[in-house]
UniProtKB/Swiss-Prot annotation:
Keyword terms of this UniProt record: Amidation, Antibiotic, Antimicrobial, Cleavage on pair of basic residues, Coiled coil, Cytoplasmic vesicle, Growth factor, Phosphoprotein, Pyrrolidone carboxylic acid, Secreted, Signal
Record field: compositional bias (Pro residues): 491-501
Taxonomic classification: Eukaryota, Metazoa, Chordata, Craniata, Vertebrata
Keyword Aminoacyl-tRNA synthetase in annotation: no
Description of the deletion phenotype: VGF-deficiency produces a lean, hypermetabolic mouse that is resistant to diet and genetically-induced obesity.
Natural source organism: Mus musculus
Name the UniProt record assigns to this protein: Neurosecretory protein VGF
Length: 617
């Protein structure tokens, strides 16, 4: 087996690159690197020979780490593709046959590598297009024989080493923000210097545009023919080497990616052609990675926003439906309550016929009252009619108050359904109808008056809007009409006894009873000493009137008994001789409040029926 002697040339190229970068900073290509020291070269060569071939990734990354101060800033602002081109050119020279006999065989690869390295460094520091350097002439390969089999093995080993080195170089990217800023600043300075020089030479805008366009064309690489297919082994090694997450950062930090591609693809392709291996096309995946992540995040946010909007819309629809259903139930209950009350103030729904019948009935009553007055009993009959009218009005108000109380109690409950409310409200109507039928004795009117068809149609339409069945509305209307007919033909009800006048409403709180009058009160001028013979019964008064059980009466001048009771009025129990006054005042206050509440509820119900139900289309 032939010994492996390639790492020496590779390390030599590394040293040349390091010294060139240290001597020529970005933007100043006139400074050339100083000569290398033999001691440093030998030390680095020994370290490189002792390093195993497969375990190169940690050491190369450690060499790229800018933190140690003894090694300096390695690969400061260097494109990894340019570095790869230098290494490939250096690896290609030992494999080629010697073109110069004698001692020149050793110096030819070194000179070619140095020239290629200098050109690569200049391409990194200059924004102007660098002239292509022709690859050194390679002698035609000798015919393959069986004696050259070891060389082919060495060639395959070299290709494997090159693939591993390329994998390491692809993983390399300057993640330091400071390094990116320095590289971008150097390129901007170089570009500004170039454009300024062109402007100074020929200030015309056309010349400046041509210079910029020529620079752009020089930077963009020409399309080369497609390379031969990639070997399977090399393709597998390249597919395994995935780019690091910092690759898109490298693309963002560099202002013109085409410049780097144009400067590095040409020497790298020539090096591959000299080795006889294929040249893989370099594709920029940074933008695709970045664009894919941003697009996915944007789509995810849009989807979440759409889901949230749909959820809010469904919630609003559900709340609106619940509100509409609740209002419909309330309106249906109010309509049913109004129909069961008899339609005392029905104007448009009840129709005109009912109002005409009521007007005729009132006219008949007035005529009868006038006839009775003419007969001689005007005063008595007038008083009886007034009392009957008052009694009827009071009975009607009591019935309405009871129904309103039931209605508002059901509205506050809010949990019972419309069917339960309807059944609770229809039951009193049936009971009253049966009671009136029993009192009437089974008499029925033959002349059944039918309601106006328009009124019935309007009621049915209103019931449909209020979620009430049409059959229920028709039955309710028929029951109300039958009740009115029976009430019209029924004998007059007995007049109830007059109700006691309610207490005045201005009394809000019961007044305390007046104090009891003092007994055996002596004049003030005779109050030298208390008359013990006259107050024997008050020395120890009974317990309820004494604030303390162990009270001791002092033997000094005391005020009269009446004044003492005034002092202890807050501790005494309420007077026993006025128990009915407080109860009467309390009852009067409660009745006044109930009457006020009833009138207010009645007024609200009438306003709702007149302004909402009757005017609804």
């Amino acid at each position: 087996m032939k010994t492996f002697t390639l790492p020496a040339s590779v390390l030599f190229c590394f040293l040349l690159l390091i010294q060139g970068l240290g001597a020529a900073p970005p933007g100043r290509p006139d400074v050339f690197p100083p000569p290398l020291s033999s001691e440093h070269n030998g030390q680095v060569a020994e370290d490189a020979v002792s390093r195993p071939k497969d375990d190169g990734v940690p050491e190369v990354r450690a060499a790229r780490n800018p933190e140690p101060q003894d090694q300096g800033e390695l690969f400061q602002g260097v494109d990894p593709r340019a570095l790869a081109s230098v290494l490939l050119q250096a690896l290609d020279r030992p494999a080629s046959p010697p073109s110069v006999p004698g001692g020149s065989q050793q110096g030819t690869p070194e000179e070619a590598a140095e020239a290629l390295l200098t050109e690569s460094v200049r391409s990194q520091t200059h924004s102007l297009p660098a002239p292509e350097i022709q690859a050194p002439a390679v002698a035609p390969p000798r015919p393959q024989t069986q004696d050259r089999d070891p060389e082919e093995d060495d060639r395959s080993e070299e290709l494997e080493a090159l693939a591993s080195l390329l994998q390491e170089l692809r993983d390399f990217s300057p993640s330091n923000a400071k390094r990116q800023q320095e590289t971008a600043a150097a390129e901007t300075e170089t570009r500004t210097h170039t454009l300024t020089r062109v402007n100074l030479e020929s200030p015309g805008p056309e010349r400046v545009w041509r210079a910029s366009w020529g620079e752009f064309q020089a930077r963009v690489p020409e399309r080369a023919p497609l390379p031969p297919p990639v070997p399977s082994q090399f393709q597998a090694r390249m597919s395994e080497s995935a780019p690091l997450p910092e690759t898109h950062q490298f693309g963002e930090g560099v202002s013109s990616p085409k410049t780097h591609l144009g400067e590095t693809l040409t020497p790298l392709s020539k090096a591959y052609q000299s080795l006889g291996g294929p040249f893989p096309k370099v594709r920029r995946l940074e933008g695709s990675f970045l664009g894919g992540s941003e697009a996915g995040e944007r789509l995810l946010q849009q989807g979440l926003a759409q889901v949230e909007a749909g959820r809010r819309q469904a919630e609003a629809t559900r709340q609106a439906a619940a509100q509409e259903e609740r209002l419909a139930d309330l309106a249906s209950d109010l309509l049913l309550q109004y129909l069961l009350q008899g339609g005392a103030r029905q104007r448009d729904l009840g129709g005109r016929e009912l109002q005409e019948t009521q007007q005729e009935r009132e006219n008949e009553r007035e005529e009868e009252a006038e006839q009775e007055r003419r007969g001689g009993g005007e005063d008595d009959v007038g008083e009886e009619d007034e009392e009957a009218a008052e009694a009827e009005a009071e009975a009607e108000e009591a019935e309405r108050a009871r129904q309103n109380a039931l209605l508002f109690a059901e509205e506050e409950d809010g949990e019972a359904g419309a069917e339960d409310k309807r059944s609770q409200e229809e039951a009193p109507g049936h009971r009253r109808k049966d009671a009136e039928g029993a009192e009437e004795g089974g008499e029925e009117d033959d002349d059944d008056e039918e309601m106006d068809p328009q009124t019935i149609d309007s009621l049915i339409e209103l019931s449909t809007k209020l979620h009430l069945p049409a059959d229920d509305v028709v039955s309710i209307i028929e029951e109300v009409e039958e009740k009115r007919k029976r009430k019209k033909n029924a004998p007059p009800e007995p007049v109830p006894p007059p109700r006691a006048a309610p207490a005045p409403t201005h009394v809000r709180s019961p007044q305390p009873p007046p104090p009891a009058p003092a007994r055996d009160e002596l004049p003030d001028w005779n109050e030298v000493l208390p008359p013990w013979d006259r107050e024997e019964d008050e020395v120890f008064p009974p317990g309820p009137y004494h604030p303390f059980p162990n009270y001791i009466r002092p033997r000094t001048l005391q005020p009269p008994a009446s004044s003492r009771r005034r002092h202890f009025h807050h501790a005494l129990p309420p007077a026993r001789h006025h128990p009915d006054l407080e109860a009467q005042a309390r009852r009067a206050q409660e009745e006044a409040d109930a009457e006020e509440r009833r009138l207010q509820e009645q007024e609200e119900l009438e306003n709702y029926i007149e302004h909402v139900l009757l005017h609804r289309p």
